[in-house]
């Protein structure tokens, strides 16, 4: 993750939510927040490094329930008044709310788990989150670590924006409802149990949309904001001509 992009990503967060209501429409209103982002840069980088060091890998049953507890703490530290660990039949999730007294509410999707890794394939420990000067390609200072891009880096940048807004004495123009899961990397098998809880579902129904922080800034600094996304579905399709009554009753070559 490119270090100075923390500033840019946090400002992008402000721009997205500032567009809902004109609370931060003037540049003068954004100036103290931008200054706070710059002042808290090292703090934000350290927060991400610490988070990368807290590994949760669902496929290896590693880092639970500590990963969920850590996620809840990050939310509370960023200003969420409520952050609760929700147990499921699999790995726990986190449900958090930030009431800014605003007329509109935005949902947030977070994931705190990462893919498994082989340390031998890394130039430095994937849990160390080492800062290196990347020359090829010329990126400058970057963090090397599992989750730096997918997905803790973008999420940490979002949380950094919340810290900066509060530090500048400003109030968010929207309320936030966060749902964070710990099984995204294995296909989110238990997220229905999380989002269908009556209290979580009630909060989500009040949201005008759902935002997922992601690494969408290219090397030229251009940012792409996705306005929609598709989910994942796994299924097994069985075509049985015999039962249908209009096809072969035994196995045939696939070309037929």
Give a label for each model feature.
Residues 142, 147-228:
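Acidic/histidine-rich catalytic neighborhood of metal-dependent amide-processing enzymes
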Residues 20-25:
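Sec/Tat signal peptide C-region and signal peptidase I cleavage site
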Residues 202-203, 218, 227-234, 246-256:
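Acidic-enriched catalytic cores of C-N bond-cleaving enzymes acting on peptides and small amides
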Residues 26-148, 167-174:
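Acidic/His- and Gly-rich active-site-bordering loop/insert found
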Residues 1-10:
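Bacterial N-terminal signal peptides that target proteins for export
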Residues 142-144, 243-249:
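Short small-residue beta-strand/loop micro-motif enriched in glycine and branched aliphatics
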Residues 9-19:
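Bacterial N-terminal signal peptides
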């Amino acid at each position: 993750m490119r270090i100075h992009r923390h500033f840019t990503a946090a400002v992008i967060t402000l721009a997205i939510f500032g567009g809902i209501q004109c609370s931060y429409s003037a540049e003068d209103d954004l100036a103290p927040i931008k200054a706070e982002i710059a002042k808290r840069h090292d703090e934000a980088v350290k927060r991400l490094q610490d988070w990368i060091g807290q590994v949760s890998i669902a496929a290896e049953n590693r880092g639970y329930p500590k990963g969920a507890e850590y996620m809840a703490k990050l939310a509370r530290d960023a200003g969420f008044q409520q952050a609760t660990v929700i147990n499921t039949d699999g790995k726990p999730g986190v449900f958090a709310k930030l009431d800014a007294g605003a007329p509109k509410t935005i949902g947030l999707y977070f994931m705190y788990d990462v893919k498994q890794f082989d340390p031998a394939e890394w130039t430095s420990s994937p849990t160390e989150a080492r800062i290196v000067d990347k020359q090829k390609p010329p990126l400058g200072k970057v963090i090397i670590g599992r989750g730096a891009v997918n997905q803790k880096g973008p999420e940490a940048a979002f949380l950094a924006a919340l810290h900066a807004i509060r530090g500048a004495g400003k109030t968010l123009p929207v309320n936030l409802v966060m749902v964070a899961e710990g099984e995204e990397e294995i296909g989110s098998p238990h997220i229905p149990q999380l989002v269908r809880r009556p209290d979580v579902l009630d909060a989500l129904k009040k949201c005008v949309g759902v935002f997922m922080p992601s690494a969408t800034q290219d090397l030229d600094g251009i940012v792409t904001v996705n306005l929609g996304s598709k989910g994942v579905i796994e299924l097994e399709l069985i075509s049985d001509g015999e039962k249908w009554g209009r096809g072969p009753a035994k196995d045939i070559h696939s070309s037929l």
